[in-house]
């Protein structure tokens, strides 16, 4: 982080930046963490193939914190897993390597060559260390030789740092110097510290550890050094021994270990304990090591009940925790003594690394090891069986000691496990610890000559004995302390024991506390907790219990007994510290045992004295309340009822976290009670609705996006299931609230113009759902009866009974097919049993709902009748907004929900109100558009709407339905025999969004709530769209259970368990294959609110949701689905026929029908636009009149033929045309723009201003485009489990947890590379193809063998080639060795494996007939279940180089200068010798075509409209090229051409993370973006540019920066999160430009993000890097460089070396100084080098999201985009306005000369006289004294000998042409060629085609200066850490900033952010946002005496609380002026 401190009022003011915690005490409060956690966080470097979840880790990764100095692992590896036994997938060893690029941080180690240690971060989810080491190559041996302080390999194993940390823990708890953690200490513990001191600072040792770890040295004394050193050998030997393990059970255990470590981290992540971070460090040690039981693995998500199995011998488990045989212990002790010296000095070689290459496996522990384990199939099966039994036994007692576990180990299992044999039977606490100790012993014995292979047969026995011995050491200390705790009567001894117990637990984890006697210690601590008279004992006892739950997560099952005692401390508070500690413990307990707390009355107790606690304790109390509400049942409502008023009042609190916990509490209550109307009314009785309504409209918003969604959804549920609450909300003016949320603050009374505020699709969906539920339900008969068919067939939804299974908390869950398959698999693996039950389905009887309906009318409908004014106000307020949301949304979910809401409004509004409301909306054209949709739901809804409108307003709509094409479309539907039978290839979204396959699944989706006959009228909002926030949402739940058993705080259970069946209800699609696995995966696609499910889900948004609750809803058979679809089609056909018959058959449709008048006029005028006859301009005038004066509809424009005819009229250039094209365009401009008639141009300057008719034409054409286009949108949205994971993050989770199975095969055509014999591999679907190449090449598969070499079996299959690994690491563009094929298709290297398989595999081709992206966004199940064959063969020499994905060299080749070509040489000869220059190209020529341009390959019904709009835009932009003297301006601003519908689709597409990760952008989007960029606004094209131009990590980073809510869920754990490498360089400010050139030379073309630090300054990261680009931009403007035209100026506020330096300035932007033919080559070379550097700098800035501060002119950007051929004299004004004005006068003389010469009346004498009389301001041309040299550059001749040629009236035209050409082209050609060459060495220039020249300044330099208003600042800036928006200082600041002028703004921005300019979008786009925090001082200090300081890395402004606004203004300006160009410590 970069700090710019200003602490001294008058002293030198410095800016500082820093990232290490140790030197930044002032900011600990800012980070919200204590010192220890900061130091740990800054040292936590994410492992490349893992993700860090911590805050510090994230900042370090993103902002380039100082921890980036630590080196990364050496080479990247694809995420590949061996799967030798596909049939037994759960038992397969799977080792994961994550994909990344060839170089970069994301690569896990193949051969770790690391010189500095790295600690595994607290939140990193590591794989098993055994697996890491097994894959580690031999050269790692040398690492220990360097010093006794082990520099652990960062990529391979975390064991060394673990040992170092273990030694820390040993020192803390004991003074013994033994290097083995098992040694107990007789010495006393460290002196205890108070809680305050613990919170205030870390332990000395921990601080020291953190600091020294950074320095790369060990933290402890000699003995710990020896420990660290010897641990290196132990870890390696452990890995070697493990290489012979049996593969099947081992793999399962390794995976579990990883998952459980995740669970531990997530559990402790939110704990407020001050020692959490040090614990986190310890926890990372156990990642992947722990063996743990299946049931507890699933506890956190599936909550399986405890099994009812027992094993012989398990009864004595608890009593056998004594140390093992004393003989072995003594031997080990003596062995340790004798080898102590040896271990202190590094061994010459690590014997543990000696392995047979045959033992190595490709990324697996032992999956393909050729050395057998000695077990046959029978033995392995027995081992697996025994392991399962042990697993299930572990379920029953997670706290048993290690010795007990070892005694349970069956004999048969031991033989299969080698050295780690006991792993399968021991608890997670000791397994890894013991394995590594065993490895250490093995290493020591090998060092003494013991053959390592002896450990194979003897390993299991040795390890069992060894585990007993080692485990006893850890538990003996606890046993001693336990005796102290139980010393009744001796309170001092009990206190001492409690203090020591705290210390033991605070530094321990499951590894170091193996065998800890939880069941004995907890009762003793509970006893101490009840000693009311002794505060210290109670405090330490409660702390110990808290620490125990952090260190040993499973102990919470025992600590739950302490709940009553904890609650006692809250009922009567004697000691506030004890009460707050009790709350901390209860909060941890509530994550898994909330039911126990609730039933003990804990919810009320926690809230009893809420206001007396500190803010952290209050947050804990509210978190407990929220967790208690998670699974509350109606029977338990009384536990929470009394607390509701307090919770309701809490919603008005200032603290954001408290408010969010309270909201979560109510959301869960409403969710659980949604079918209990009386309870919902009680929950909402105490001002809840009012308070939440106020909460929603707070500005700036208090709620995060996820919580906002949850709260709005809660309202929807309440309105849906309790209509009287909807009535209450309507009376509370909820309509205005909703309008505010969708449109922002209203501007006065103008409600006609509706501008939606930016909202995510999920937010829009919930808001429209709420509007829908506020209106009464639609009826169930008549035209709405079909809605029931749009859901699943009712036969499947009305089962009389449902089956349920019970979890550990006693909750019953619906048991459906997916559950069945998953749980069967779990049962098979674990032997788990669980209770099930059968119960009646309350919604089975379809008549029930009907009776309810008869009994009571909907309260909402009553309100509509009783209070029509309120209803009218509601409808008028929201109808227009809803309509706008529908029009501007691309996602089908939102559109369906809007359609339902609009249908409800139209149905219940009376005719007069409807007429008023619909007056300003083109409803008819929208209905016509919907009727042409491919989506059945849209078609049905539009027919229903048309019917209602015709019933209510027949007079109005009988005309409009004809004119807008509704009648035409309905007739088509009525007449179509085969409706929607064969879908088009491209399915479409929006108005036409569903193909038949889509419908197939849509109709089977249990998604609609329109089933009137099934239950209450508003039965559950969440079922009708799978976008629910429920953890029970099937996909996320299944995946969590199956793959990611995190055991931390549960995600909010926001939807009921009944929602579990949603995926099941969404059914197998008819194309699903029959294998169980594939049908399971096929049904994993919940077609949710993004693309499909919601199409079925939301259109029928009537609130009855039976299918969701029916639990056992069956999957309908294919016939049923097809039958339903056919019924719907039949209904549509029938309804359309009735509609036509009823409303349109009675009239005779002839020419007299008034509805056809406009169409007939338009057809007549269009026919006259004939190219073969001259019909004058009358037809154009008629068209202009119709378009601009009448309300001509899109339908009429389409059907009149106007589009096609006008396109031909403007583009045809045939010789047969009677009028030339230019003439026709001028006529068009005359009619539509007011230009003169051709041939009658006036003599003066042409500057027409009337653009009305052309603007109207463009708008009509855009409407046609919106109605006709059918572009598909590929979105991958899944039900969001917790309200946070929106927009595809659930789909990312799917990719996170699934892999593709590929069989690598050598291509049949080649025999000169090795054949892959490793069996199928599992590959990360988002890995790139080049990752497979890297994987194979570093193992020797890329080496071409000589003919005489042996066969494939050379014993080195798995050997990693170190040189190749290093080559991949060091070179970003390594030469490709292998190429890959699927079938006959050659795969591009930069394509993802998923995309390759989906696009090219045979299965994919077969399936493409029956599926598409819309129906199965994740692909058919076959993609995930079948094995895909990928062929590889070596790259031929002639092919090498052309296949590379990197664009650097290719770009250079394309832009190589062509001066040497004969044609070019001839042209230059003519220029120099004869003064002949090329004519200026007319840019219009490239656009005036009537066929699609080269860049367009898609086909769409709207193609002609697109081409016409492209022509109209080019005419608007370049019309002045057709005239001699026209003003250079656009007729219509480009913004008027933006198409809102296409923009919505593009934005929706670009917000889908999965599309970006897979590179699966639709072709229409990229092609339209380049050929018709005017359809999209700049920010959309900017995002499209970043997605297509760079690597996917940059694209993903850009997406996360612009859409932070995507990152709110678990993307830190995601292996698809962006991993951008960062490279740091140190720069000397005195040689800035020189060193910048050097840096760009070295790193310009690197994919790594460049980060800058300055010499003698500590700052690094975002701020200094931003400043680097700004300062280099400034340096490039120095006058002495001679690069630019302009005037020399000095800076107004120079700093350092800037004083006395002159800079170039031009009011219109900088442009290159021209070269003449005689310029010295040395000078040219120097200038060219600078321009080449400028090109690299600009490209690198764009690539790294940095901003330059370089004001370049428009002609410069035209050169960038290769538009130089069309640069003309019009552009001179943007270079030198003075010269441009003079040339304009001279051009006027030329025009006068031409008119005189054309005048036939002149004789030769009078002609000569008239020409000589021409003058400029009274001065003749000859008298001007001009010659043929360039104005302002007398040394540059315009042609050879030009300085001797005077300018006369006769050669004036040649002179002007040459001046323009030399200024804009010839004189600057070499500079721009060098510039392009430099630019293209970074990335190709053609990617900039998305932008216009005038937009490149925004792309490069950000937004231009604009006024800052207080409102914008309030919305975009974030007060924090001491300030709120109401704080005086914040209000002062906004007022001061809003008064700044442009220069002051630049100074302030450079001070705070490092760059003097904001990104496009201003403060809204600043990332991170500007945060104002309070700068604190001692009580004796006056804030007015201090200056503000900043942290540029995170854009923090640390602002003192000044006493007046004048003082603040003064101090801010001083700081901004003086605090530049330095980054030092605060």
Swiss-Prot record:
PROSITE patterns: HECT (PS50237), WWE (PS50918). The keyword DNA damage applies. Residues 94-112, 135-161, 171-188, 199-241, 412-430, 1068-1079 have a biased composition (Low complexity). Residues 1919-2026 form the HECT domain. CDD domains: HECTc (cd00078). The active site is at residue 1993. The keyword Phosphoprotein applies. It catalyses: S-ubiquitinyl-[E2 ubiquitin-conjugating enzyme]-L-cysteine + [acceptor protein]-L-lysine = [E2 ubiquitin-conjugating enzyme]-L-cysteine + N(6)-ubiquitinyl-[acceptor protein]-L-lysine. Pathway: Protein modification; protein ubiquitination. Residues 1040-1053 have a biased composition (Basic residues). It comes from the Eukaryota. It is an enzyme of class 2 (transferase). It holds the Pfam family HECT. Residues 789-876 form the WWE domain. Residues 379-391, 1056-1065 have a biased composition (Basic and acidic residues). It is found in: Nucleus, Nucleoplasm. Keywords: DNA damage, DNA repair, Nucleus, Phosphoprotein, Transferase, Ubl conjugation pathway. This is E3 ubiquitin-protein ligase TRIP12.
């Amino acid at each position: 982080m970069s700090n710019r401190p200003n602490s001294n009022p008058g002293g030198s003011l410095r800016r500082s930046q820093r990232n290490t915690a140790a030197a930044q005490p002032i900011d600990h409060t800012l980070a919200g963490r204590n010192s220890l956690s900061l130091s740990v966080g800054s040292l936590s470097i994410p492992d490349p193939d893992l993700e860090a979840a911590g805050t510090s880790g994230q900042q370090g990764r993103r902002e380039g914190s100082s921890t980036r100095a630590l080196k990364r692992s050496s080479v990247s590896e694809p995420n590949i897993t061996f799967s030798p036994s596909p049939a037994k997938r759960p038992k397969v060893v799977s080792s994961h390597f994550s994909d990344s690029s060839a170089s970069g941080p994301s690569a896990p180690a193949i051969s770790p060559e690391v010189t500095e240690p790295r600690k595994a971060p607290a939140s990193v989810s590591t794989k098993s260390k055994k697996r890491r080491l097994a894959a580690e190559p031999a050269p790692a041996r040398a690492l220990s030789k360097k010093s006794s302080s082990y520099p652990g390999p960062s990529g391979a194993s975390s064991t060394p740092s673990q040992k170092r940390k273990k030694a820390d823990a040993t020192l803390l708890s004991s003074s013994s110097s033994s290097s083995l953690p098992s040694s107990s200490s007789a010495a006393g513990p460290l002196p205890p510290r108070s809680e305050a001191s613990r919170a205030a600072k870390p332990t000395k040792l921990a601080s020291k550890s953190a600091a020294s770890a950074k320095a790369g040295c060990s933290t402890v004394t000699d003995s710990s050094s020896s420990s660290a050193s010897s641990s290196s050998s132990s870890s390696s030997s452990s890995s070697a021994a493990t290489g012979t393990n049996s593969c099947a059970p081992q793999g399962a255990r390794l995976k579990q270990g990883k998952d459980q470590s995740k669970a531990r981290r997530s559990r402790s992540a939110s704990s407020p304990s001050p020692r959490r971070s040090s614990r986190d460090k310890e926890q990372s040690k156990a990642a992947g090591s722990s063996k743990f039981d299946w049931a507890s693995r699933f506890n956190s998500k599936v909550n399986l009940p405890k099994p009812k199995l027992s094993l012989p011998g398990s009864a004595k488990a608890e009593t056998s925790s004594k140390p093992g045989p004393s003989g072995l212990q003594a031997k080990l002790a003596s062995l340790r003594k004798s080898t102590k010296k040896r271990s202190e000095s590094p061994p010459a070689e690590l014997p543990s690394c000696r392995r047979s290459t045959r033992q190595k496996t490709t990324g697996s522990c032992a999956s393909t090891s050729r050395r057998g384990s000695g077990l046959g199939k029978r033995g392995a099966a027995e081992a697996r069986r025994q392991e399962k039994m042990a697993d299930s036994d572990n379920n029953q007692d997670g706290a048993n000691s290690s010795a007990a576990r070892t005694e349970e180990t069956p004999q048969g299992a031991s033989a299969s496990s080698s050295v780690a044999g006991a792993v399968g039977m021991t608890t997670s606490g000791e397994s890894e610890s013991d394995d590594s100790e065993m490895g250490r012993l093995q290493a020591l014995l090998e060092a003494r000559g013991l053959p390592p292979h002896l450990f194979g047969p003897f390993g299991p026995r040795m390890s069992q004995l060894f585990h007993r011995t080692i485990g006893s050491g850890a538990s003996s200390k606890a046993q001693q302390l336990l005796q102290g705790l139980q010393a009744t009567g001796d309170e001092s001894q009990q206190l001492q024991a409690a203090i020591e117990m705290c210390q033991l637990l605070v530094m321990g984890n499951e590894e170091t506390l193996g065998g800890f006697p939880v069941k004995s210690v907890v009762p003793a601590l509970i006893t101490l907790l009840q000693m009311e008279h002794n505060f210290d004992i109670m405090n330490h006892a409660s702390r110990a219990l808290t620490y125990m739950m952090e260190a040993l997560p499973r102990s919470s099952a025992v600590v739950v007994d302490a709940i009553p005692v904890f609650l006692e401390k809250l009922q009567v508070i004697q000691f506030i510290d004890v009460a707050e500690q009790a709350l901390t413990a209860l909060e941890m307990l509530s994550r898994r045992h909330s039911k126990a707390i609730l039933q003990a009355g804990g919810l009320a107790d926690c809230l009893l004295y809420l206001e007396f606690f500190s803010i952290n304790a209050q947050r804990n109390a509210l978190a407990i309340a929220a967790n208690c509400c998670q699974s509350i049942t109606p029977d338990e409502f009384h536990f929470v009822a009394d607390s509701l008023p307090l919770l309701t009042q809490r919603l008005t609190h200032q603290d954001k976290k408290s408010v969010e916990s309270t909201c979560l509490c109510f959301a869960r209550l409403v969710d659980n009670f949604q079918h209990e109307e009386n309870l919902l009314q009680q929950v909402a009785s105490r001002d809840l609705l009012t308070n939440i309504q106020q909460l929603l409209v707070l500005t700036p918003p208090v709620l995060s996006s996820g919580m906002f969604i949850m709260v709005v959804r809660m309202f929807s549920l309440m309105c849906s299931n309790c209509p009287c609450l909807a009535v209450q909300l309507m009376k509370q003016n909820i309509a205005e609230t909703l309008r505010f949320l969708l449109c922002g603050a209203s501007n006065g009374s103008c409600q006609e113009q509706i501008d939606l505020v930016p909202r995510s699709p999920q937010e829009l969906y919930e808001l429209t759902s709420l509007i829908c539920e506020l209106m009464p339900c639609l009826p169930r008969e008549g035209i709405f009866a079909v809605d029931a068919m749009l859901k699943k067939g009712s036969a499947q939804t009305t089962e009389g009974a449902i089956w349920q299974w019970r979890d550990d908390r006693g909750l019953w869950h619906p048991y459906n097919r997916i559950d069945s398959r998953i749980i069967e698999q779990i049962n098979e693996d674990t032997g788990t049993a669980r209770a099930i039950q059968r119960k009646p389905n309350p919604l089975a009887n379809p008549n029930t709902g009907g009776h309810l309906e008869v009994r009571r009318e909907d309260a909402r409908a009553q309100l509509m009748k009783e209070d029509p004014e309120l209803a009218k106000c509601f409808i008028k307020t929201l109808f227009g907004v809803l309509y706008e949301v529908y029009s501007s949304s691309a996602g089908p979910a939102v559109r369906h929900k809007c359609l339902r809401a609009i249908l409800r409004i139209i149905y219940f509004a009376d005719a007069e109100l409807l007429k008023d409301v619909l007056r300003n909306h083109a409803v008819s054209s929208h209905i016509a558009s919907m009727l042409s949709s491919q989506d059945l739901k849209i078609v049905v809804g539009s027919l229903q709407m048309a019917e209602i409108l015709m019933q209510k307003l027949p007079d109005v709509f009988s005309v409009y339905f004809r004119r807008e094409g509704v009648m035409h479309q309905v007739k088509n539907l009525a007449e179509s025999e085969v409706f929607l039978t064969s879908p088009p290839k491209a399915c479409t979204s929006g108005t036409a969004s569903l193909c038949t396959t889509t419908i197939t699944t849509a109709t089977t989706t249990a998604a609609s709530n329109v089933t009137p006959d099934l239950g209450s009228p508003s039965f559950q909002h969440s079922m009708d769209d799978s976008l629910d926030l429920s953890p029970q949402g099937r996909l996320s739940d299944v995946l969590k259970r199956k793959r990611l058993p995190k055991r931390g705080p549960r995600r909010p259970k926001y939807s009921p368990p009944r929602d579990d069946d949603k995926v099941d209800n969404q059914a197998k699609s008819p194309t699903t294959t029959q294998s169980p696995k594939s049908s399971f995966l096929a049904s994993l696609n919940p077609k949710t609110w993004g693309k499909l499910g919601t199409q079925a889900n939301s259109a029928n948004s009537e609130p009855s949701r039976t299918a969701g609750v029916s639990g056992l809803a069956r999957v309908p058979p294919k016939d049923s689905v097809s039958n339903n679809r056919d019924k719907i089609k039949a209904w549509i056909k029938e309804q359309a026929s009735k509609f036509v018959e009823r409303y349109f058959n009675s009239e005779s449709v002839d020419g007299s029908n008034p509805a056809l008048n406009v169409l007939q006029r338009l057809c007549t005028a269009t026919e006259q636009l004939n190219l073969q006859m001259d019909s004058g301009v009358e037809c154009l005038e008629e068209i202009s009149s119709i378009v601009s004066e009448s309300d001509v509809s899109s339908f009429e424009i389409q059907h009149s033929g106007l589009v096609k005819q006008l396109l031909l009229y403007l583009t045809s250039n045939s010789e047969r045309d009677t009028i030339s094209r230019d003439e026709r365009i001028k006529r068009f401009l005359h009619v539509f723009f007011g230009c003169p008639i051709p041939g009658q141009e006036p003599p003066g300057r042409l500057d027409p201003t009337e653009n009305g008719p052309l603007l109207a034409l463009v708008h009509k054409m855009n409407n046609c485009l919106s109605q006709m286009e059918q572009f598909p949108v590929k979105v991958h949205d899944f039900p969001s489990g917790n309200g946070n994971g929106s927009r595809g993050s659930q789909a990312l989770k799917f990719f996170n947890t699934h892999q593709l199975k590929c069989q690598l095969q050598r291509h049949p055509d080649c025999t000169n590379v090795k054949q892959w014999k490793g069996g199928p591999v599992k590959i990360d679907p988002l890995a790139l193809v080049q990752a497979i190449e890297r994987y194979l090449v570093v193992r020797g598969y890329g080496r071409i063998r000589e003919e005489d070499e042996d066969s494939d079996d050379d014993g080195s299959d798995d050997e990693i080639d170190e040189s190749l690994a290093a080559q991949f690491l060091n070179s970003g563009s390594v030469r490709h060795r292998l190429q890959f094929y699927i079938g006959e298709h050659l795969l591009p290297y930069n394509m993802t494996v998923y995309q390759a398989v989906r696009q090219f595999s045979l299965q994919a081709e077969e399936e493409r007939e029956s599926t598409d992206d819309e129906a199965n966004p994740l692909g058919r199940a076959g993609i995930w279940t079948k094995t895909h064959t990928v062929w590889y063969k070596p790259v031929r020499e002639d092919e090498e180089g052309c296949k590379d994905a990197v664009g650097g060299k290719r770009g250079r080749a394309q832009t190589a200068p062509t001066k040497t070509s004969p044609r070019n040489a001839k042209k230059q000869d003519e220029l120099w010798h004869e003064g002949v220059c090329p004519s200026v190209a007319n840019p219009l020529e490239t656009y005036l075509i009537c066929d699609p341009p080269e860049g367009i390959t898609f086909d769409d019904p709207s193609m002609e409209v697109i081409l016409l709009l492209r022509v109209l835009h080019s005419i608007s932009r370049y019309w002045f090229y057709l005239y001699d003297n026209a003003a250079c301006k656009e007729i219509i601003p480009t913004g008027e051409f933006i198409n809102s519908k296409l923009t919505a689709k593009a934005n929706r597409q670009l917000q889908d993370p999965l599309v970006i990760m897979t590179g699966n952008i639709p072709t229409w989007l990229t092609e339209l973006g380049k050929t018709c960029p005017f359809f999209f606004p700049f920010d959309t094209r900017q995002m499209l540019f970043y997605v297509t131009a760079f690597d996917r990590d940059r694209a993903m980073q850009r997406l996360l920066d612009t859409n932070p809510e995507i990152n709110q869920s678990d993307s830190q754990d995601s292996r698809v999160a962006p991993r951008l490498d960062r490279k740091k360089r140190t720069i000397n400010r005195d040689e800035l430009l020189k060193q910048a050139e050097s840096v760009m030379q070295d790193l310009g073309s690197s994919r790594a993000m460049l980060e800058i630090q300055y010499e003698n300054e500590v700052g690094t990261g975002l701020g200094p890097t931003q400043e680097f680009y700004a300062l280099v931009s400034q340096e490039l403007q120095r006058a002495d460089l001679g690069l630019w035209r302009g005037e020399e100026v000095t800076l107004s506020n120079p700093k350092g070396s800037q004083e006395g330096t002159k800079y170039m300035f031009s009011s219109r932007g900088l442009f290159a100084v021209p070269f003449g033919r005689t310029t010295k080559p040395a000078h040219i070379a120097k200038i060219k080098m600078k321009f080449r550097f400028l090109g690299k700098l600009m490209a690198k800035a764009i690539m790294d999201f940095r901003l330059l501060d370089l004001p370049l002119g428009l002609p410069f950007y035209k050169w960038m985009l290769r538009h130089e051929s069309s640069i003309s004299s019009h552009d001179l004004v943007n270079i030198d306005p003075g010269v441009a004005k003079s040339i304009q006068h001279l051009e006027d003389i030329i025009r006068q000369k031409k008119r005189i010469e054309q005048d036939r009346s002149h004789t030769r004498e009078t002609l000569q006289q008239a020409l000589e009389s021409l003058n400029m301001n009274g001065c003749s041309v000859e008298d001007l004294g001009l010659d043929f040299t360039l104005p302002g550059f007398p040394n540059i001749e315009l042609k050879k000998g030009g300085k001797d040629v005077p300018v006369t009236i006769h050669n004036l035209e040649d002179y002007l042409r040459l001046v323009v050409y030399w200024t804009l082209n010839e004189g600057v050609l070499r500079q721009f060629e060098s510039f392009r060459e430099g630019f293209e060495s970074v990335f190709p220039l053609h990617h900039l085609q998305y932008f216009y020249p005038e937009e490149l300044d925004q792309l490069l330099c950000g937004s231009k200066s604009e006024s800052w208003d207080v409102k914008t600042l309030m919305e975009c800036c974030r007060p924090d850490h001491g300030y709120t928006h109401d704080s005086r200082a914040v209000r002062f600041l906004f007022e001061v900033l809003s008064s700044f002028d442009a220069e002051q703004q630049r100074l302030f921005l450079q001070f705070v952010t490092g760059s003097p300019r904001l990104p496009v979008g201003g403060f809204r786009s600043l990332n991170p946002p500007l945060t104002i925090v309070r700068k604190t001082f001692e009580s004796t200090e006056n804030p007015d005496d201090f200056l503000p300081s900043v942290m540029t890395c995170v854009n923090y402004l640390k602002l003192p609380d000044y006493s007046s606004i004048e003082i603040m203004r003064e101090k801010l300006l001083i700081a901004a002026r003086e605090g530049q160009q330095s980054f030092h410590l605060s």
